[in-house]
């Protein structure tokens, strides 16, 4: 009988019920995959992510944990707004249709979700809570509004957080980001900078790479803030530096375009720079304009020119730098461009300037290139010697740092400072499809929070997307409202929250049955025990979520600082790329068709699956052709979860063959499998029968049936023990390898004489494959007479007595050449071992011609003739 995966999978998907259990012996286990944006279709990356989490959830449930394994939808965002404009539909309707489609797709994979906890962030009963959070953050001083220069995406027509700018481009649109000055709402993530940094070390089950990325993004720097007097103005320029010892090598200062000083110097040149400037500029060009101002050097009788430069960021430190071109690559390039002095001050620095400098200085135009060995941070050491530096001459760098700080503090123009690269999170977005910010602006009362009893502030449905910009800002009625204080006409805030606001707390909403934030439920289920998602979220989502936990704890919602205990960053699903003779990207099926027609195509490298390069495979196609279990097994089989995996049609075929092989094997052995009690309990209680211990002279020959079965039983239980350990440590590909090995082992057993062992092996095997291929496992469970659902059965435990090695394999050599192997009792007496070895090769050697026999216990016997 052939395995009918289509009917089997539908049958069990309609009957599974993964409601959260109560009072489980092992306590809670919260498993969560990063929830998806409802684009309308799942892709292979989704499939891998969700199946990894599903295996963990099913295993933990079998181990007796109260498993929370929810799913929801990160439903706000610009794509819905774009779809509304392009297709003349409401974003809510477009989003709901996509959610319905994707929900059906997820159910077709057989994922063990607590569907009763499903949520969507675009629903008012969800986002009303985050509006309340915002009001509480206001009370706690964690929110403020100010006018600031922001990153403006000209394609998406909205503000981007710095974390959303990648190499000067918008993270979603890819457009070159511009600078604009707007009034924005900010969350004070910097209040928790030190705590966010320190607590990284306690996240023992996070990948080191993720922790390193967050460490660098928070960017703690210990240095000095120096005040430079601006010549001709009664103002001072504050500069933060981690290298005060290079102050005598300074040849210029530079400020960011947003610096307050610049606002007083709005020459046409500076205005042109501001209007055209990009973050770091195209190709990281260092662009600057001389302001016409100079600053006084703190110790020398000279002035340094003050520039406005595009590489200086207002958000970082003081928005100003002093440039030491001899010991900084960026400053060197700027000095070359603007012909500024280059003054070396550290004798053993490995920054080579061409032509060589004899402890003097050159201007930028005289220097043709630099040589940097081993990277900039290694250009000099703390033991390098200072020169060209007045009172620092002859000191080591380490000594010079201390002395220069003391001198600056004595003069009252410098102080030790700790700075962070991290800046406050701007959450205002100029778009419709997002959570409304609950604030009202009144000409009499100023900024007024929406009263809690008036929450939620919901979105209007009668909006116009055809005129561009933010529809809320142009709405004829929604925008206008009476002030809660004076009752005069006022206006709503028309910006909406950054969508990362919603995803920064959704894991807490899942803890409660009604999607609210129940303190007891949150403290009970949080933190998330296993969080699975891509490493691309290492800074944005994960850092914001850590901040939100601290902010919500401060507001009294729960008492959890860290949201995620174990973080699994699954690798990408990759596929070979194809192009036709004209360089046009081809879908794999198109490439296959052209090849069969004899056409020439270009086979490219293996890359992450992407729509743009057409190297995608539709999960629905695989599920329809091979079944959900085949798709699940393939994405888990050959590659550790954290590594990228390559799509392979042969691999999919191999997984399909295994599933059918397992079905046929169990059907073959079905008549001998008798379940008198819970088979899993039967397996767990199995011990070695006394007669199985018997052997002749320590050897287990093939004719000794019970002895042979002892070996099989040991291997099965060792595989069970090993794969259980692999599951505990998320080595899922190793689990697959072990249960495949177990399958082959059971298939070798003689059905006539090994009925009890087959019964035991089949019971173990069906249970351990269930987290991976649950539909087939449930079907096999039913076929062998199992009662109820398999996923509700406990996990089998390997018998400890079967894990002890009392038999070893010994090599038998004749004159140094391997001729046989034998299985003998461990630590067998050497004389017995020698005799067994001679007997095992009796067809190869005449015992009367044996001159000597040498034996190493438990390892080898060498017969010399």
From Swiss-Prot:
Motif 'KMSKS' region in this chain: 608-612
Gene Ontology BP terms: leucyl-tRNA aminoacylation
Top-level taxon: Bacteria
Catalytic activity: tRNA(Leu) + L-leucine + ATP = L-leucyl-tRNA(Leu) + AMP + diphosphate
Compartment(s): Cytoplasm
Binding site for ATP: 611
Name of the protein described by the UniProt record: Leucine--tRNA ligase
Organism whose genome encodes this protein: Wolbachia sp. subsp. Brugia malayi (strain TRS)
